[in-house]
Amino acid sequence: MHDIITTILEDSIRIKRQAVTEQVEALTAAADLLTTCLASGHKILLFGNGGSAADAQHLAAEFVNRFQIERHPLGALALTTDTSVITSIGNDYAFERIFARQVEALGSPGDVAVGLSTSGNSPNVVAALEKAREIGMKTIALTGEGGGRCAPVADILLD
């Protein structure tokens, strides 16, 4: 067990060091894009599956409530929370469209879509990023290494 824990911690340290050298430009670009979006009165739509759905909800909560400092609420919405909408779309269309349909209904040019997918290959995340681009939104993908199928439909890739 000791070796397993040591390996996990060492991997975490390695990934953080790697982010400093390999991801700082993309992280800065994402921060600038989100700042511009919110400052101009637009909103952020976040989505993902499983643990990524939980991450999307957590991020949206931090934007809407507050993060570290008292401030005005910021427009962010996790598309993973309305079970009636999700199951209706999944039933009437397909599970692959549960986020794209919501992006189409709620997104506008100037908004930012943030898709989270560990593999980068979740069909419903890819479809939502594609729909966001189609309607004039900017896109950010948070994925595992390489970005998978999300990479070509992301304006900014954080992998």
At which residue positions do the language-model features occur?
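Short glycine/serine/threonine-rich phosphate/pyrophosphate-binding segments
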Residues: 52-57, 121-128, 150
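Generic N-terminal amphipathic, Lys/Arg-enriched alpha-helix
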Residues: 1-22
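A short, well-structured juxtamembrane/interface segment
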Residues: 22-40
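Short, glycine/polar-rich helix-capping loops at beta-to-alpha or helix-loop-helix junctions
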Residues: 141-156
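Surface-exposed amphipathic alpha-helices with a cationic face
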Residues: 129-133
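Glycine-rich, small/polar surface segments that engage phosphate groups of diverse ligands
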Residues: 35-107
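A short, small-residue-rich loop immediately preceding and capping a beta-strand
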Residues: 43-47, 109-120
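Short, well-ordered beta-strand core segments
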Residues: 113, 139, 157-158
